[in-house]
UniProtKB/Swiss-Prot annotation:
Subunit structure, as described in the record: Homodimer. Heterodimer; with a rar molecule. Binds DNA preferentially as a rar/rxr heterodimer.
Task performed by this protein: Receptor for retinoic acid that acts as a transcription factor. Forms homo- or heterodimers with retinoic acid receptors (rars) and binds to target response elements in response to their ligands, all-trans or 9-cis retinoic acid, to regulate gene expression in various biological processes. The rar/rxr heterodimers bind to the retinoic acid response elements (RARE) composed of tandem 5'-AGGTCA-3' sites known as DR1-DR5 to regulate transcription. The high affinity ligand for rxrs is 9-cis retinoic acid.
Protein name as it appears in the record: Retinoic acid receptor RXR-alpha-A
Nuclear localization signal: region residues: 128-133
SUPFAM superfamilies (UniProt xref): Glucocorticoid receptor-like (DNA-binding domain) (SSF57716), Nuclear receptor ligand-binding domain (SSF48508)
Biased composition (Basic and acidic residues): 174-186
Zinc finger annotations (NR C4-type) as residue ranges: 103-123, 139-158
Binding site for all-trans-retinoate: R284, A295
Ligand binding (9-cis-retinoate): R284, A295
Family membership noted in the UniProt record: Belongs to the nuclear hormone receptor family. NR2 subfamily.
Entry annotated with the keyword DNA-binding: yes
UniProt free text on domains: Composed of three domains: a modulating N-terminal domain, a DNA-binding domain and a C-terminal ligand-binding domain.
Amino acid sequence: MHPSLLSPTSLGPSGSLHSPISTLSSPMNGLGSPFSVISSPMGPHSMASPGVGYGPSISPQLNSHMNSVSSSEDIKPPLGLNGVMKVPAQPSGTPLSLTKHICAICGDRSSGKHYGVYSCEGCKGFFKRTVRKDLTYTCRDNKDCVIDKRQRNRCQYCRYQKCLAMGMKREAVQEERQRAKERSENEVESTSSANEDMPVEKILEAELAVEPKTETYIETNVPMPSNSPNDPVTNICQAADKQLFTLVEWAKRIPHFSELPLDDQVILLRAGWNELLIASFSHRSIAVKDGILLATGLHVHRNSAHSAGVGAIFDRVLTELVSKMRDMQMDKTELGCLRAIVLFNPDSKGLSNPGEVEALREKVYASLEAYCKHKYPEQPGRFAKLLLRLPALRSIGLKCLEHLFFFKLIGDTPIDTFLMEMLEAPHQMT
């Protein structure tokens, strides 16, 4: 297939949408499919297995969060440490790490070794502030004030002198500050590198470019007979059919997608179209109460869905996707990254180079994690929370496919050209 098939769709003289493939004399152009890449000849195994999960591909960045709990502080005391008083010896067999210490400065309970000495959080913080701000103190008495748990705040001069006498090191505070600075610089460099490979700005642009311009919303919350031309199942199918037209345009705007072999682009779109559309209308429905907002501007209420016999899957969309997206206030950049992760599915059958697709997915993971750290620094678990929506999206996508195949089988629901093409694709290729 010629690369020109990936040119943008256009409006004809009548205002109707024309496929980019309509200008070619291919025998497969009769349907006028919006999937310019879909008409590429493929082998019998180009359809992705619907049962493939996200498990093995979960980002190593997520794993790093789960493995970073080891302490940098050594709480095992060296024998004979000056100024440290031990509680009575523990019974034999008690791990040394469980032995409790008291603060060498004031006698309060120690929280570990800080700047070379076992000390409490209060004395640790006092010493750090003194060094970092280069503070100087004076003693009102004879520079021999008692420093204990009750009186440690009475004389800052004597408290600081005792910190030094017990072995606290000024240079340890300065080294800690330098390490923090270097760590921050490394994180900025890592964030910049990840974003250069897979810029989230481009992913956001892709989302905004295909966003439906719906000015008015039509609400359907009155139950209608299932054979009505306006029943919710028909409305959803018609909206999905229209959105399939924009899906290729969206994918072409995702960084590096158009660089993949044409047949691989076809495979990835066929494998993920249902999840990609579900993610979109779920996020679009965040502001809607007890319903979903379709790209056509139609608001489908859950009462209508229950009347049409699709209440169970409809409620799953509301509780597992729409509600979760609303609660965490998922933004469009995060939505775009999740959809890009779905698109770059290395487990799709028939890919010529799954490793290349997996590398692109990893780049999206890295960019999304960096974006979350930068945009939401007060929510360290946000990246993981976003990824946890993917299994629910996969499960709901499979169930929706089952419903669509059933509607196609019984023939009660009109299914338009493009959606029918996607449902019949596996049979056409075998």
